Amino acid sequence: MEETRAGRYIVRAGSGGQTEDTASGAESVLATLAAVRTRRRSVVCDGPPGSPTDSARHMSDLASLALTAEFGLGCLEAYVRINAGQVLPVVWPPGWNLVLQEIETDEDFKPEDVKAWSHYLCCQTRLAFVGRFVNEGVLSPDQQKKTAVCLISDEGYVFCYVREDTAVYYLARNLMEFARVGLRAVETLHCMRYLTSSLVKRYFRPLLRAWSLGLDTMARFIIRHHGQFMPLTYPPGTELRLCNLRCFENSVEGGHLLRNIKTAFGMRVLGLGTVSLKGENAPFPHLRWPVDLIPIVVAYTGAVYACDVRDDRYIRVGDNLNTFMCLGLNLLFENRRFSGHNGIYDRVPDCPKGRQHR
């Protein structure tokens, strides 16, 4: 890997990078982008932080970053070098920002770390370090501090590495899509503070309170409230019907699934209830277990799992009840977490390139 200095930045020659012959071209591209940014900012008048004009200015900066990424990782790294320290607000979660930064100046990570993270993904991909995601707000009781960095692939896909999760999350197909969705794919960032449905919060609070008092208290709560319906955030219109799942454990089709997960966790697993994907919440009246009636269990670790009778396996739908409350069954249908050491109960991560991996 050779490095060629071009003006105020370094252009790297290597796989997917810039060559010495294109260094001047990259410099020309950056000069053009700088002129475009200047023209855009001259149109947008100054305003106080948080004002519409301030938001438009930040969108202009993000659009410039997105345009640079289209010219390759060499130009992108040069842009980050020139604009190091620039702060770009993230649309979600509130109070989070992307701070542009070079990997060489980062105190915790090195270039070889970025290369190691690329091996988490399902396909061979080169990643570029763009900066850190920083939370300016005060953490709520159900939040944990996260060390998150922004990564962009040679094809323009946006990823996020979270050190506490030891995982890389696939965020968006490009930076402009990222501008609309933010960090929503990072499941561990979801918490009660960011949940907009007051109805879901109201129904889940007693359940969370029972869980905080221990597994036995949780078991008694489920028996006491057997048959109660609790709204879920996803899929829209679905509800969790509280049940200890004795009916499922005794069924022919799926009973072995519950017995297997109890064996895996030393019997310390509670049946939480069922979710009908058809929206029909009648009690279980069939001789055979319907494939669209999803049993939900919670392990002593707090992780929540859905039993998929069709594929004869159970899938993690939340690292804890808080995450399950915020995401519903989202992880049953979509998984964007690429983990370096676990994930055997996860749905197969969705390949950014659209390939099928099993």
UniProtKB/Swiss-Prot annotation:
- Please provide the record's keywords in A-Z order: Virion, Virion tegument
* Residues forming coiled coils: none
Look up the domain of life of the source.
Answer: Viruses
Q: Identify one Pfam family in the record.
A: US22
Where does the UniProt annotation locate this protein?
Virion tegument
* Cysteines paired by S-S bonds: none
Main location group: virion
Protein name per Swiss-Prot or TrEMBL: Tegument protein UL24
Taxonomic lineage is:
Viruses, Duplodnaviria, Heunggongvirae, Peploviricota, Herviviricetes
